[in-house]
């Protein structure tokens, strides 16, 4: 029976792990045991943060839309409600982009949203709740 020497395979595995650990600080970049643990952990973070990234972008789009809509006297929630009642289906990413790059088109959507909301007064700028509070 011939003897199997696994040096080549082990070296290839170690090289793969150390390549993934490139740029890490301290022993994590050059000792195999520390590098393996660090790379495994970094993969877990990457997996988790791919999901978190989606949440963060949605929150950013909502903040941008809210800021743009408040200039017209609406809130984000009422604006979205008005769009739904008007039957306008535009996702938040596109709305955010329109608010930044195409303010005129976004303004048209705001006006369409205001018209669809029945609780706005004839002026179209303030709702009943805001006027009752003052």
Swiss-Prot record:
A single Gene Ontology MF term assigned here is:
structural constituent of ribosome
Q: Name one Pfam family in it.
A: Ribosomal_L20
Q: Which UniProt keywords apply?
A: Ribonucleoprotein, Ribosomal protein, RNA-binding, rRNA-binding
Q: Which GO cellular component does the record give, naming just one?
A: ribonucleoprotein complex
Protein origin, superkingdom: Bacteria
Q: Which GO terms describe its biological process?
A: ribosomal large subunit assembly; translation
Q: Where are the transmembrane segments?
A: none
All disulfide bonds of the chain are none
Xref: PANTHER family:
39S RIBOSOMAL PROTEIN L20
Q: Which HAMAP family match?
A: Ribosomal_bL20
Q: Write out the similarity annotation.
A: Belongs to the bacterial ribosomal protein bL20 family.
In Swiss-Prot or TrEMBL terms, this protein is called Large ribosomal subunit protein bL20
